[in-house]
Amino acid sequence: MKVDIDTSDKLYADAWLGFKGTDWKNEINVRDFIQHNYTPYEGDESFLAEATPATTELWEKVMEGIRIENATHAPVDFDTNIATTITAHDAGYINQPLEKIVGLQTDAPLKRALHPFGGINMIKSSFHAYGREMDSEFEYLFTDLRKTHNQGVFDVYSPDMLRCRKSGVLTGLPDGYGRGRIIGDYRRVALYGISYLVRERELQFADLQSRLEKGEDLEATIRLREELAEHRHALLQIQEMAAKYGFDISRPAQNAQEAVQWLYFAYLAAVKSQNGGAMSLGRTASFLDIYIERDFKAGVLNEQQAQELIDHFIMKIRMVRFLRTPEFDSLFSGDPIWATEVIGGMGLDGRTLVTKNSFRYLHTLHTMGPAPEPNLTILWSEELPIAFKKYAAQVSIVTSSLQYENDDLMRTDFNSDDYAIACCVSPMVIGKQMQFFGARANLAKTLLYAINGGVDEKLKIQVGPKTAPLMDDVLDYDKVMDSLDHFMDWLAVQYISALNIIHYMHDKYSYEASLMALHDRDVYRTMACGIAGLSVATDSLSAIKYARVKPIRDENGLAVDFEIDGEYPQYGNNDERVDSIACDLVERFMKKIKALPTYRNAVPTQSILTITSNVVYGQKTGNTPDGRRAGTPFAPGANPMHGRDRKGAVASLTSVAKLPFTYAKDGISYTFSIVPAALGKEDPVRKTNLVGLLDGYFHHEADVEGGQHLNVNVMNREMLLDAIEHPEKYPNLTIRVSGYAVRFNALTREQQQDVISRTFTQAL
């Protein structure tokens, strides 16, 4: 919508001095601004500058708190009676005179806020876990006076849904905390200023008057008008919050420091007001590079100052914290917030979107050391400049802090070069698309239900529909598949029904006004489902098909263990016999999900992703027909089961790359660990070989999708074993797990052991 603001006014003319293009001035269109003004960079990293003394001093101050967190597995501090909002806290600083970019979630570094609107129970559990008492008035307010998202969901859940939740056939549902996975276009605040954005919402609100008076789609129209009003209110709150730090963000940013600061204030408002499971940053590096390059040309900024701006911005992202429970940590370990920033990629016009600022973002892993946040994600294309490819490979080899995603696949699929990644692997066009996050369904447990007639093998209660159990002495593949298909139908209904409830209630009681204010009015919504236990279910079905699997039953006839006679092909070795089973399961479940009605007509998608919940899923799932023992962790994401991918890196990568993105458009996570020696004896060879692996895995053409996502760890198992025994020697040791990075010291002992038990590829 065209915005009727006089952009010839001095405030806008000064801010946009030297910027090319006109469409983006008349209506909100950040992509158009970028395409007209960014400077592609095809050189190497030799221009980069070291950290300033201020950066080093500030980061050491932050690290003091992080060391306390690592040692205690507890927050440094948290509020006791303030319900956080965008404006709830006064300004907070690390050391104000040294900070080029300012702003904290609360009034002190690493102090955590209370987010009661998603649910009071998680906060109560946190108080109990960390030895504090909740203020009685605060508890009364959010129990009796102000209904929360969590209360709304559990008021409406069915008994079947509650049993699915208890058994672990559905796990990680966002029914007690913020759903997240929404990416505000935080760049809009820097480019346009708050006044421009507020005016757009006022015009859009007025535009609905006729529809309202005619009674057209009445409930949806009223809801949209209320949401637009909330957007306007949230934008003004962001302006008020920034004023506490001495900044007037009603106008556009006029220089690089203001552009970084304005953008960060927009993101800060999001993490002040929501505790979503994933609070992604978006695609900011090349946008900010435009301002930095303009300041370079004006002679008001040099390279070290530019790096300092980025360092201080990234430092603030590294400090974002939410108050979580130990139970949450068992699912999503190590305080992840998934502040995912995508870097690189190619434009639709064939130009690379790599800029010098792309290098600066990666360089923060040197200036301040490795860190899990922000979740730095390389959008990989075979056409990326070779110097950037090699630099990214070098950063991975040294820090194990990067993940890679297939730009050639997703750019083509979206027909957009302005998309980003929500959480770990979920692509969406920035400002035009949002996601209803849906956690994941346990396919391995579903297979056991298919064998046992819907009885849970751990709880010994009826969870699925009551059907005749499969009582053959040797499991018959066709019968098992028929039964599994029936139970997948049932699971899809329970899953989508639960998600419809969750997202209705989240919109009602914990709406993300500050994030949605930075979207177009009419957004494309997806309902993001997920699969866990894919490799367990796949190998189990392969064993049933190609070997002889005999159920071992308890006194009630329940299959509680399995005896395998013979060998069977295992997923992860580029064997079509078993890889085709994995592909079928992905396609089969997606088609069942897609057939069901969804809240707000969201388009169903699914991911193959577990985060660190692969450990909890293993705990909740009994012995499986592939020979996996009860309690043993699942493989993460789309990974082959630990130790079963025996034919080297290329075979394992090839198996995973076969999984159809067409039926898993919420992403397919693969975590790849390789010992340094397998990549080569010297650094130049290692970089070249890693670049070659990435090019091969992500290769995309008309008939070949290519892999979608790859975590890369380059390290020896022996180092991780030493880190368990001597954590003080490795304060910043960062590893990639399923879809994100985490400080190794922040994992539980069980999760550390799970990481160590995974395949470390010894050869290409």
UniProtKB/Swiss-Prot annotation:
Pathway: Amino-acid degradation; L-threonine degradation via propanoate pathway; propanoate from L-threonine: step 2/4
An MF annotation (GO) of this entry: formate C-acetyltransferase activity
Record InterPro entries: Auton_GlycylRad_Cofactor, Form_AcTrfase, Form_AcTrfase_GR_CS, Gly_radical, PFL_dom
Modification Glycine radical occurs at: G739
Keyword Metal-binding on entry: no
A biological process from GO: carbohydrate metabolic process
Region Disordered, annotated ranges: 622-645
EC annotation from Swiss-Prot or TrEMBL: 2.3.1.-, 2.3.1.54
UniProt family annotation: Belongs to the glycyl radical enzyme (GRE) family. PFL subfamily.
Protein name: PFL-like enzyme TdcE
